[in-house]
Amino acid sequence: MGPGASSATRRMLALPIDGHLFFAGEATDTEHPATVHGALASGQRAAAEIQAADKPGPIVVIGAGVAGLGAARDLTAFGREVVVVESRQRIGGRVWSDTVGGAPVDLGGSWLHGLRDNPLADLAASLDIDLVHTDYEDAALFDADGRPMEWAHLD
């Protein structure tokens, strides 16, 4: 699926198979695709679909990214037995911070697209995570080699 995919394509990608295999991930979210917000929303949607399918037994969630963790959290809240499997030695999927030169650096999703009606903003607040307002007036732009660029180059 390429950039700019339609909502219909995203809905099709999210369709369950045989009532047993459910899909989540930011690419399946029609309102916030390509965002962490969309990943979380897709996990919540998949969890609701799984619960509505009313199939007995434990549920396996493949992937401990935001979509998988969101689905697992909601399914657990529904009282379901959930096992999350992850291929990496860490959770979070594309949301990842590391230390570079003694300073924390975000290597994945790190920006909330709006605070109003964004469940990630609520989650950040509940975890006492500081949020910093984006100041577009004072933003800097750099090329792939780290050299400063003028914004006019983007026009």
Region annotations inferred by a language model:
Residues 1-155:
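FAD-dinucleotide binding site
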